[in-house]
């Protein structure tokens, strides 16, 4: 486990500069961020963002009037996120630090909300991470998350294609999550799902063969993110859970 975390930390240390330059402008991230912020509407008090990356969501959380704590496994991402907040929301109530989702350095029942995007898929197992999320949430608090959707068309077709070709993914590629399994894991930990959506409507191999057409289709389908059919097509699963 320690070796896997060190590898993930090293990967995102190396990606930090790229995240600063590109991540905030990518449509896949922008559409994902819009959905999670909609799910956080109405939250008051204190929020923890786990896996904050280069900090692209932090100004939005501050604009919502929230007191923000943010952590990332990567020290380089922490440095970029801290600078992003200083530049865009100087004086905002935001603390950024290195941290591990499986050992959160916060007391029990501290937060009104927890946000994590692109985190759970890098863990070999998710039980300890979910337990920590539940622990630091206040009763009635909510968790909003985004993960690759293992039930979506893109990941199903891509996985089947690679199996037929005998190809192997790189060790650090985030593993897509099955929505119903994730929902069940959170329910078992004392969290009730209150809403969900899907985004990033990309299709394999179109995304690689015709990226411009793929982007147009993605943008065309994005308004369907909350329809019941969205999890069948969206490559990203977004969900909100409330602590019972």
PLM region spans:
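Class I SAM-dependent methyltransferase SAM/SAH-binding core
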Residues: 54-103
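Acceptor-substrate binding/catalytic loop of class I
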Residues: 164-181
């Amino acid at each position: 486990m320690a070796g896997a975390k060190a590898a993930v930390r090293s990967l995102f240390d190396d990606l930090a500069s790229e995240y600063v330059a590109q991540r905030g402008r990518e449509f896949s991230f922008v559409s994902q961020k819009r959905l999670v912020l909609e799910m956080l509407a109405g939250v008051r008090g204190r929020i923890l963002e786990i896996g904050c990356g280069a900090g692209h969501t932090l100004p939005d959380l501050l604009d919502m009037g929230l007191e923000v704590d943010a952590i990332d496994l990567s020290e380089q991402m922490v440095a970029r996120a801290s600078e992003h907040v200083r530049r865009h929301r100087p004086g905002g109530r935001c603390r950024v630090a290195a941290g591990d989702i499986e050992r959160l350095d916060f007391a029990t029942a501290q937060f009104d909300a927890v946000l994590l995007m692109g985190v759970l898929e890098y863990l070999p197992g998710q039980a300890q991470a979910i337990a920590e999320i539940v622990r630091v949430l206040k009763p009635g608090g909510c968790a909003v998350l985004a993960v690759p959707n293992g039930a979506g068309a893109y990941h199903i077709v891509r996985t089947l294609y690679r199996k037929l070709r005998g190809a192997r993914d790189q060790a650090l590629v985030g593993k897509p999550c099955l929505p119903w399994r994730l929902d069940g894991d959170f329910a078992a930990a004392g969290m009730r799902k209150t809403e969900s959506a899907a985004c990033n409507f990309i299709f394999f191999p179109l995304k690689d063969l015709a990226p411009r057409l793929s982007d147009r289709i993605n943008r065309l389908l994005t308004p369907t993110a909350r329809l019941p059919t969205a999890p069948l097509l969206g490559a990203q699963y977004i969900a909100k859970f409330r602590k019972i």
